[in-house]
């Protein structure tokens, strides 16, 4: 009994649950645990062998067990290898961008916190980027970002091909403050990605606010530097981490840094 208690304590110290469920973890620790079993077995069976020598001759089977240093435990734990599976409603949301023809509706919908909460936390940021930068939607699809996503409504999952709210039957209009709020979120997001792990610039930090205010002043929306806060509760950190981990992040940032983009006031200036 002492042998099994020692073995249990040793294995449990390495998190038995993770060891069983994570195959890569299990493979890496298997030699260590096997060696520990052998070590404990040697200690136990050397003591037993000493007692047998004092009492009776050992049998060939006992000698074989002592030579291997590992008791024959095979067959005592005959497990099928199967595991209880998750139910069908366990699908997690994933980042998605919907269809290009609906991107304006999707961006307008993501301004609503209640609607946004049903989707993966990265989805609103991707939708806002696609709304701001023409051509980005197709580029994201080409690198594997999905159109469709599982949403969580109540305790049930449903698959959606579009992230916009059903109430928008017609194309919605954006007011200036909404557009500036989307720009602010994208500013937080892109500065966070560009800063990277070597320079911890937090989103909505003083450094980001200064740059955003300067941008708003340059396009004639000075007051929006303070008041464009409709998405202040929509933290970009999830999207920063997710995009930064993608293999295409370098190409995205290179394109944004060296691309030539028109001013957000281009249409207003042409009409005046």
UniProtKB/Swiss-Prot annotation:
The cross-references to Gene3D superfamilies, in alphabetical order and at most eight, read: borna disease virus nucleoprotein, domain 1 (1.10.3040.10)
* Listed Pfam families: BDV_P40
Q: Where is this region: Disordered?
A: 48-70
**Superkingdom of the source?**
Eukaryota
Q: What does this protein do?
A: May act as an RNA-binding protein. The C-terminal region is highly homologous to the bornavirus nucleocapsid N protein that binds viral RNA and oligomerizes. The viral protein also possesses a nuclear import and a nuclear export signal. These 2 signals seem absent in EBLN-2 supporting an unrelated function in Human.
Leftover remarks: Bornavirus is a non-retroviral RNA virus that does not generate DNA forms during viral replication. Therefore, integration of EBLN-2 must have occur through a mechanism relying on an endogenous reverse transcriptase activity.
Tell me the protein's name: Endogenous Bornavirus-like nucleoprotein 2
Query: Origin organism of this chain?
Result: Homo sapiens
The coding gene here is EBLN2
